[in-house]
Amino acid sequence: MAIQNTRIKTAGLLLLLCVLAVPLLAPSIVPNEIRAQSANDEIPRLANGRPDIQGIWDFRTITPFQRPEDLADIEVLTDAEAVAFEDAENERRDRDNFTDTSTTGDYNQFWYDRGTEILDDGRTSLIVDPANGRIPTLTDAARNRNQLRTKAAQEAAGVEVRPLSERCIMGFNSGPPMIPSAYNNNVQLVQTEEFVLIHNEMVHNIRPVKMNASSHLEVPRKWEGDSIGRWEADTLIIETRNFARETAFGNSSANMYLEEKFWMIDADTLGYEF
């Protein structure tokens, strides 16, 4: 899946990120739908002419979300540097090579599915804007929210205040927005005239995107927020608001506004940006 243009607007935190395309592999399962495709169009389409983005898509990559500090001045690796980076990163992440036996409650390497390669273009981060490939400095309000959330998790009086990913309510890569992570980097998309359904493998969250709605529901606030979609030419644009306080991305507030875009690059590659 391609993560290409990230735009996150929040109260107290404003990020303007462009996240580079992470190619999704060809869908392994495609729901049965009538497909209409012209001889000069490589993009699969439904009978109504809309791009057919349905299928199960893979968005794994070991390209870091943020550029590592030791690569601060390097935007793109050479082919040789990319191979060296992949070898070193795969070696570093291989749990079977760990010698520290004091850790409990962790997995061995068998359970991880991060992928083994960086993006084809050799970029050193998914973030492309800011130019340094890193998330901008948090505002005071965002830092305060982070401290409060960390304290709440450390001093939890009951399971109700433990992190959602720990309780398997929301997956840590399912978002929204979706970001490659340790495993379960797969998402299924299903289209109808009224809805687009986004089904993440991680914890099996299903997010309905309303295609014919004109306004967002303010209550109840939901884990995945309230999503409304529209087509602009061949690009699906999804706007999401009214997140639950516990699920706001990147230490933002529950007033976070998220815009995502999906588009077909070719028959086997889906573009995704947020």
Report each predicted region and the residues it spans.
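PEST-like low-complexity, intrinsically disordered acidic/proline/serine-rich tracts
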Residues: 2-274
